[in-house]
Amino acid sequence: MEIPKLLYIAVIAIGLSGSLTCATPLANPWADPEAEANPEAKAIAEATAEAIAEALAEPEPALPALPLLAFLFSLPAVQHWIEKNWING
């Protein structure tokens, strides 16, 4: 059973946005309308969108690297969840 390429890319995008919001919660452009005017947050969002578009445009032989990237980008979110729920109570 093959896992769709789009699923890996979605995990990477969620991991990127999660690690950004965990590191700097006030720079979350989805929660704070004033943050949309922040050029740094806008540049990060554009770079993420561009990286996803490039990954979707690549041919399928690039697929073996996507599971590793998805795993690596999910680690900050997992670490944040563990710290929040287990360590800090």
UniProtKB/Swiss-Prot annotation:
Signal peptide: 1-23
GO molecular function annotations of the record: sodium channel regulator activity; toxin activity
Propeptide position ranges: 24-61
Modified residues (Asparagine amide): N88
Tissue expression from the record: Expressed by the venom gland.
Protein's cellular compartments: Secreted
Keywords: Amidation, Ion channel impairing toxin, Neurotoxin, Secreted, Signal, Toxin, Voltage-gated sodium channel impairing toxin
Entry GO terms, CC: extracellular region
Superkingdom field: Eukaryota
Role noted for this protein: Vertebrate-selective toxin that causes pain by targeting voltage-gated sodium channels.
Membership in a protein family: Belongs to the formicidae venom clade 1 family.
Record protein name field: Myrmicitoxin(1)-Pr2a
Species whose genome carries this gene: Pogonomyrmex rugosus
Lineage: Eukaryota, Metazoa, Ecdysozoa, Arthropoda, Hexapoda
